[in-house]
Amino acid sequence: MDGDELTEQETALYDRQIRVWGAGAQRRLSKSHVLVSGIKGTVAEFCKNIVLAGVGSVTLLDDRLVTTEVFNANFLILPDENAYVGKTVAEICCDSLKDFNPMVHVSIEKGDLSTLGVDFFEKFDVVVIGYSSRATKKAVNEKCRNLAKDVAFYTVDCRGSCGEIFVDLQNYKYTKKKLDETVECELTFPSFEEAVSVPWKPMPRRTAKLYFAMRVIELFEETEGRKPGECSLSDLPRVLKLKKELCEGNSVSENHIPDILLERLVSNNTEFPPACAIIGGILGQEVIKVISGKGEPLKNFFYFDAEDGKGVIEDLSHKL
């Protein structure tokens, strides 16, 4: 991601943030290429943040047609029906993001994310997936891992006032300050498939309840053939039945996953804007950190619940 020096125009535009993270980090940002799929409220916040930060390019992939329901959860889509009739979410968001920072190349890609070949992902440094099934997350993550270069992979899922971020940086090297020294560090990340298949019983008792709840909801949607977020309160009895089966299969108490938490996740499919802003901000910060190579990255799950206002990082792998 290193390249030529910043132009005079870039230096002037990004002057304030260059003072924070340095010209080298800004140069790496300006040469980076980010793919974003599934643009709902949280992902829209993320896109705004990285475009304002000055990444080189953002490619948007979301072929859903814009509807009233869609624009209610996405501030990049203005509530003007005449402006979005017949247009996709990616097309409308692309136009809005260009206005935020004309120096960032924002484009769209059409197609089904799950059917794109491995070579498609080679042109990107970062891949961010929102609003996707468990199977799609696994498949795209595996394709990114099969590339000759390391591609930073993220998933984000916000349901009501709760959210989850997953991170896979494969083998990642970075620097951090330790007293007066700059220390080189390295982290090894598990894949999405590895991270969501960790046995529950050996996990620390303090592990975020949202981790387990998200696994139940994802599996329910997959087995029922639902799209992400296509749950309602009427599904709760079957969701609770699946929870019971998963807890028994993992030899843990059903108290691992409070019923009230699952009820919140299935009954509120509209993203809570303040939660979107916080989770999208954290995700943007992490991507900027990884592109710049400065600072310790999040490993490998982040959870936020607006009900208690707490953010929790969980490092989960088979090496527990």
From Swiss-Prot:
Pathway of action: Protein modification; protein sumoylation
Gene3D superfamilies: NAD(P)-binding Rossmann-like Domain (3.40.50.720)
GO biological process: protein sumoylation
Source superkingdom: Eukaryota
One GO cellular component term: nucleus
One function term, GO molecular function aspect: SUMO activating enzyme activity
Residues with N-acetylmethionine modification: M1
Localization, UniProt: Nucleus
Keyword list, A-Z: Acetylation, Ligase, Nucleus, Ubl conjugation pathway
Protein task: The dimeric enzyme acts as an E1 ligase for SUMO1 and SUMO2. It mediates ATP-dependent activation of SUMO proteins and formation of a thioester with a conserved cysteine residue on SAE2. Functionally redundant with its paralog SAE1A.
Protein name per Swiss-Prot or TrEMBL: SUMO-activating enzyme subunit 1B-1
Organism: Arabidopsis thaliana
This protein's encoding gene: SAE1B-1
